[in-house]
């Protein structure tokens, strides 16, 4: 089945926040990210995770990053690796609602061994991105150890490292569909009209986003969003589809308020979401739910929206 994802689809997929909920209601996410020179990727992903609604977040980082996180993002709890510069030791993961790994991780031999232990020990789906994908592409046996219903988020070059060079975009898409079904995972094949391939063979095409989002840090933010949704007990397929759409919508709002060329992962701009958008018959439900997530836009593109 091939589907184009719309605002209406997303509006009915988003969960409401119950008045008597507490932070435990919205899950505890574990993000394994960052290495020497790449702590910014971990920080962007972590902020996106909490801004997307996760109740609690623990970030496993090299010890070198402790002062960075404690200063820049005090809301996140830290799990410190034994290595000062990169991921080498596996934290206890049994108590977390969802696990994500990859942003800024680096590609070290000890990291590869630690990733294998994560895959073998996790009883929950794992979001796998960036350097975690690259490590696995160099150790293809690791793909047979991915927990079912996990989510891979490769861009085209990363996917080609996994499945081999593709002759064109359609060839790559068919490979992604087959790979997702074979390994019983979701694949988020990033790009224009990002395609989400489900284990059942369904493909969902995202209908929003723009070229301004092709910028450093954008993928790290997407990982944080999807991880957050998984922690909040969305199904992996729904977390991937909703996460990609929210990410694209944030980019479209930012592009409307600034040029695509000027978009970076933390531009500051101030614009208003018009009341007509919020109240229109067709978009009202979507935007009323979207307003709950407006702080996310500030993290993705520095977008501060006043209502």
For each predicted feature, which ranges?
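Small-residue (G/A/S/T)-rich helix-start motifs and N-terminal tracts that mark the onset
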Residues: 1-127, 134-151, 156-307
């Amino acid at each position: 089945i091939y589907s184009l994802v719309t605002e209406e689809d997303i509006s009915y997929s988003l969960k409401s926040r119950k008045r008597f909920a507490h932070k435990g209601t919205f899950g505890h996410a574990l993000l394994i990210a960052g290495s020497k020179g790449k702590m910014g990727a971990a920080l962007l992903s972590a902020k996106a995770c909490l801004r997307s609604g996760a109740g609690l977040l623990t970030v496993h980082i090299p010890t070198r990053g402790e002062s960075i996180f404690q200063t820049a993002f005090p809301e996140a709890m830290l799990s410190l690796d034994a290595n000062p510069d990169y991921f080498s030791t596996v934290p206890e993961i049994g108590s977390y609602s969802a696990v994500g790994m990859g942003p800024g991780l680096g590609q070290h031999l000890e990291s590869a061994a630690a990733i294998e232990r994560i895959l073998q020990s996790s009883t929950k789906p794992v979001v796998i991105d960036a350097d975690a994908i690259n490590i696995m592409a160099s150790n293809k046996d690791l793909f047979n150890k991915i927990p079912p219903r996990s989510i891979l988020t490769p861009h085209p070059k990363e996917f080609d490292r996994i499945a081999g060079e593709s002759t064109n975009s359609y060839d790559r898409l068919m490979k992604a569909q087959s790979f997702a079904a074979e390994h019983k995972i979701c694949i988020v094949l990033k790009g224009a009209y990002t395609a989400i391939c489900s284990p059942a063979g369904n493909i969902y095409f995202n209908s929003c986003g723009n070229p301004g989002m092709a910028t450093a840090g954008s993928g790290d933010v997407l990982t944080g969003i999807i991880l957050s949704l998984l922690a909040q007990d969305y199904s992996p397929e729904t977390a991937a589809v909703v996460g990609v759409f929210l990410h694209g919508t944030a980019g479209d709002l930012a592009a409307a308020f600034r040029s695509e060329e000027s978009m970076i992962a933390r531009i500051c701009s101030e614009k208003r979401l018009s009341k007509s958008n919020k109240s229109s018959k067709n978009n009202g439900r979507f935007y009323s739910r979207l307003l709950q997530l407006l702080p996310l836009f500030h993290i993705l593109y520095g977008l501060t929206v006043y209502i």
